[in-house]
A protein has these predicted regions:
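Conserved class I S-adenosyl-L-methionine
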Residues: 1-47, 60-64, 174, 209
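Short glycine-centered segments of the SAM/dcSAM-binding site in methyltransferase folds
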Residues: 50, 147-148
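Class I SAM-dependent methyltransferase SAM/SAH-binding core
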Residues: 50-54, 58-109
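A short acidic, Gly/Pro-enriched loop at the edge of an enzyme's catalytic core
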Residues: 108-120
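A short SAM/SAH-binding and catalytic strip from SAM-dependent methyltransferases
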Residues: 119-131
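A short glycine-rich, Lys/Arg-flanked "PGG" loop and its adjoining helix->strand segment in the class I
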Residues: 133-145
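C-terminal alpha-helical "lid/dimerization" subdomain adjacent to the S-adenosyl-L-methionine
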Residues: 151-214
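C-terminal lobe and adjacent flexible extensions of AdoMet/dcAdoMet transferase-like proteins
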Residues: 214-223
């Protein structure tokens, strides 16, 4: 599986693009992050330990995870230095610098040891990964035994989706909402085959009003 299943293009994250993402995340998209953080905790049962937010951008989901789970430390991971700088400014402004760190890294080669993180989350970045198999292989490597992922895209609820899609289309009628894309049976089968290939036998795919989310589980005692 060499190509992204959504067949989307890799974005260019220069500082202008990173600042634009930051503005949207802190305004139009702001309500979704606490909801997604709560959904992630509910879906996985993970409330403590180390959480990685992959493709964190301006750090909004990372901050929501830290705010809703006081016993959890978080690392906001992004391949863009510009995004990491903006994320750190946001983290510091929120007074969360003792709970959240930033790290530069690509999902296809994560800068973490094996069995490292209890929870790995990501909202929206999966649609830009160039090789899903390599990415999920790395994610499963870094996931600690007993850990889970909550990776995908969505708005947390149907009400928030309707609100935000309407507002974004007001701003830009050509805006491409990835939430409009639906996964069919072939897509789901490809995911099942991919997870088997990386050695993950316990997983579930959530495809409902909260969005499209992949919950991988690494069995306790696995290496």
């Amino acid at each position: 599986m060499q190509k992204n299943w959504t067949q989307t293009k890799t974005p260019v994250f220069n500082r202008e693009a990173a600042l634009k993402m930051n503005e949207i995340a802190k305004t139009v998209f702001a309500p979704i992050y606490p909801v997604i953080a709560q959904n992630a905790r509910h879906a996985t049962g993970i409330n403590r330990g180390l959480c990685l937010d992959l493709g964190s951008g301006p750090g909004m989901l990372a901050m929501a995870m830290a705010s809703t789970a006081p016993d959890m430390s978080v690392v906001a991971v992004d391949s863009s230095e510009e995004s990491n700088e903006i994320a750190w400014e946001n983290i510091r402004d929120a007074g969360l610098e003792a709970r959240i760190k930033t790290a530069k890294g690509d999902v296809h080669g994560l800068p973490f040891p094996d069995n490292h993180a209890n929870l790995i989350v990501s909202r929206g970045s999966m649609f830009f990964w160039t090789d899903l198999l390599d990415a999920f292989k790395e994610i499963f490597r870094v996931l600690a035994p007993g850990g889970h992922t909550y990776i995908g895209g969505g708005f947390g609820s149907s009400a928030l989706k309707d609100l935000i899609v309407a507002e974004m289309l007001k701003r830009d009628p050509s805006w491409d909402c990835y939430a409009k894309k639906k996964s069919d049976a072939d897509d789901l089968k490809r995911f099942e085959e991919m997870f088997a290939a990386i050695g993950c036998s316990t997983f579930r795919i959530i495809n409902d009003e909260t969005g499209f989310w992949i919950v991988l589980s690494k069995t306790a005692g696995a290496e």
